[in-house]
Amino acid sequence: MPSPDVAKRLRSLNLTAGSLHLVSAIAIVALANNFSLPVVARYEAGQPGIGKFQLVSYGSVSTALLVGLFFALSAIAHFTVAGPRQASYLANLDQRRNPYRWLEYALSSSIMIFAIAQITGVSDVAALI
């Protein structure tokens, strides 16, 4: 286990980072406009092979809400390791592992990849998932 002094500094750092990420998430959502990007799918219409397709819209996704969710997940992760899971977090750090951060990265990076794909023009549901 890290020393009590190191554990205290890590807790303080995680609480600070979590607070900043939470404030960022709230600000992004509060200042958001109604900008959203579509999610669509193309289905064959008619006989296979003739090249006739029907475009179906599944709705749209708010870019600001995606970015806000990204920051909110980071805040939750920081608060989790600073609070209820701190002992487990410190024990894992002592073994040079950080599974909480990897879980947060897995979730938040998926959201960010989705958002970046949409911003660059990808709207097909098959490509987005």
For the regions a language model picked out, list residue spans one by one.
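N-terminal topogenic module of multi-pass integral membrane proteins
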Residues: 2-93, 99-105
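Helix-coil boundary and interhelical linker segments in multi-pass alpha-helical membrane proteins
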Residues: 52-59, 113-128
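Hydrophobic alpha-helical transmembrane segments of integral membrane proteins
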Residues: 97-120
